[in-house]
Each structure stands twice: as structure tokens, then as C-alpha cells.
Design a protein with these regions (language model features):
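Beta-strand secondary-structure signal
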Residues: 21, 72-74, 324
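Non-catalytic terminal accessory segments
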Residues: 1-66
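Hydrophobic alpha-helical transmembrane segments in integral membrane proteins
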Residues: 55-79, 99-101, 105
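Soluble catalytic domains of enzymes that build or remodel membrane lipids, polysaccharides, and related
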Residues: 83-330
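Short, charge-rich amphipathic segments
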Residues: 34-50, 74-81, 110-122, 254
Length: 330
């Protein structure tokens, strides 16, 4: 809640400042030309923009972040083994459990929706928590209820390494490492998920098989503070197979996967779709080459899920997402 209040105040101040900055620049230009420029409409613009932002924020906080869409995607590739024709993967990402406190029943509904899909595999692509491993407490039974034929596989996101925890007080590196270790153990033992830490799991159907590779967070862009991925280690033993990579940050795809490996499909999250999309427009492309949906290049593909949760608890237009991906051979 403290983080929410701080961010709300900061953004409100920025929004209110925009017309005033324009006014100062305009007045300076007018002064240089020997003219006078009154405050006039700039004052009204300040009030209007601030009021609009507050209304949008309230909408995004009260309603927007609790909406949900099921995005159905067909992924086609001739390399998919015959036995995996029609294989269904549900991808979820970026739960940020601190934002679900007090809304447990709604999260149960999301789990019920996912279970109703009757997927072959559920993939979670990171950011279970926002600040602390303690956020998981009370959600174990709910998230442990996720069911798929081949179970739930997961990777860590940048927030799951708790880099934003402890200000103040600062945690010692040893204490932080212990907290991360406990969170990883809780994901495995309390949720029953298969957590892939630079490793892989082979899924078999008769004589056919596919590899699901899980890489620890390897950010190559604006959030490059967490770089623990070891793709070579994670992919060991999967050579020549149809391969699906789970990696939290989509910048990893262009940084180390695309054109550098023969990994067919990568699933990522992290961007939240920037949590804002108005009239089909998002600030995402200003920061990320790939920020939402399916991308294909040179026979390799990336899907970016925009998450079910939020860091700042509001979403405007960027509706929380459950992805249902069906594998089809050409």
C-alpha cells in the first residue's frame, strides 16, 4: 500500500506538472518575442489533466486490475512431434501476490477458469511476489489447486529475487539469499509446482517428447539488474528436440535466443503490457521490442503474456491475461 500511495502521488505530480512546463516554455518564448502570455487555459489544463488522471487511476485500481481475458493462441510449427498435435498450454505470469490480498476469492475464480480449460501443461513465467516472500502466505492452497495433465512448471522473475525488498532496512546478502531459497522451496513444496532453475524437463507422449527449458531471470533491457540465467546449462540434453523456453523477461529472447539457438518457442511475461492501453495504444514499444502477444522471426517465436497481477495496483486497458496456446503441426 505504501508503494501504491507513493507512486500515485508521484504520477499525479508529473501529470499536473506537464501543462505548467508547457506554460513556462511558452511564456519564455513569448517574452523573447516581446509579448505577454497569461496563465489562462494552462490552469484549466492542469486541473483537467489531474482530474482525468485521478479518475483513470481509480478506475484502474477498483475495476481494471480485476478484469481478465482468456487469450487463445494457435502456435504452428512443423517440428512439433505428432503425439503433441493439439497439445494445450496455459501460460500465466506476473501474479504479484501482494495485490491479491483481500481478493482471495477472485484469485480462486481465476484458478477455476484455468482448471476449466483442462490444459496439458500450465506454465508460470515469473514474478510470483513483488517485494517479499511472505506475500505467498495464505495463497498456498489456492495456487496449489492449479491442475494440468503434466502439472505446473515455473521460472523465477526479477521480483522473485527480492531486489526491491528491504529499503529500509537493507538486508544482508546472506539474509536475502536465504529468503530467496525459502521462496523457491515454498514454490516447490507448498504449491507443488516444478520450479526450473536453469534446467529442463522432458515431457513424453509414447515415443515422442518435447523439452520445456526453464531459465532463471536474464534481463537484457531496462531491468538488467537481475541476470542469473544460464541458457546453455538450462538447455543441456535437449538438443534436437522441439523446445519451449520459459524465461521471464522478453528481452532475453532477442538478446540470447533469437538467431543464436534453435529454440522454437519462448514464453515470457514481465512487461504487464505497461498496464496502460488507450485506444489500442500502449507505451510498451517505447521500452520493449516485444511487449505483448505473439512475435515470430526467422522460424522462432516469442509469446509475451501481460500478466494477471500488477506492481502498481491499477490497469487501464491492459487487461490481465490467461493465455491458452494450442500446438499445431503444419
Amino acid at each position: 500500500m505504501r508503494f501504491t500511495i507513493i507512486m500515485f502521488v508521484v504520477i499525479t505530480l508529473v501529470v499536473a506538472a506537464v501543462p505548467n512546463i508547457v506554460f513556462v516554455v511558452s511564456r519564455s518564448v513569448a517574452w523573447l518575442r516581446g509579448r505577454q502570455l497569461g496563465y489562462g487555459w494552462f490552469g484549466y489544463a492542469t486541473l483537467a489533466m489531474t482530474a482525468l488522471w485521478v479518475m483513470m487511476f481509480v478506475y484502474g485500481m477498483v475495476w481494471g486490475r480485476f478484469e481478465c481475458k482468456v487469450a487463445r493462441v494457435t502456435y504452428r510449427n512443423e517440428a512439433i512431434p505428432a503425439a503433441f498435435e493439439g497439445y494445450t498450454i496455459v501460460q500465466i505470469s506476473d501474479l504479484h501476490l501482494d495485490g491479491w490480498r483481500g481478493h482471495e476469492e477472485l484469485l480462486k475464480e481465476r484458478v477455476a477458469t484455468i482448471n476449466g480449460i483442462d490444459a496439458d501443461l500450465i506454465c508460470f513465467t515469473g514474478d510470483l511476489v513483488s517485494l517479499s516472500r511472505a506475500e505467498l502466505h495464505g495463497f498456498e492452497e489456492i495456487l496449489g489447486g492449479l491442475k494440468a495433465k503434466d502439472g505446473v512448471v515455473a521460472v523465477m522473475g526479477n521480483h522473485d529475487y527480492l531486489p526491491y525488498d528491504g529499503l529500509p532496512p537493507l538486508r544482508s546478502p546472506r539474509s536475502k539469499a536465504k529468503e530467496i531459497e525459502i521462496l523457491q522451496r515454498d514454490i516447490t513444496d507448498r504449491l507443488g509446482w516444478r520450479l526450473l532453475l536453469n534446467e529442463n524437463v522432458i515431457i513424453r507422449r509414447g515415443n515422442d517428447s518435447i523439452a520445456v527449458i526453464g531459465c532463471e531471470n536474464q534481463s537484457m533491457g531496462v531491468h538488467s539488474v537481475i541476470r542469473r540465467g544460464n541458457l546453455k546449462k538450462a538447455a543441456t540434453g535437449t538438443e534436437g528436440m522441439f523446445r519451449i523456453l520459459l524465461t521471464h523477461d522478453p528481452t532475453h529472447w532477442r538478446g540470447e535466443v533469437l538467431g543464436k539457438t534453435d529454440i522454437h518457442l519462448t514464453l515470457s511475461g514481465h512487461t504487464h503490457g505497461m498496464q496502460v492501453k488507450l485506444f489500442g495504444l500502449s507505451p510498451g514499444p517505447l521500452i520493449y521490442s516485444e511487449y505483448e502477444g505473439l512475435y515470430s522471426e526467422g522460424g522462432q517465436s516469442l509469446y509475451v503474456n501481460i500478466g494477471l497481477g500488477a506492481t502498481m495496483p491499477m490497469r487501464i486497458g491492459a487487461t490481465p491475461e490467461i493465455t491458452v496456446m494450442r500446438l499445431i503441426r503444419f
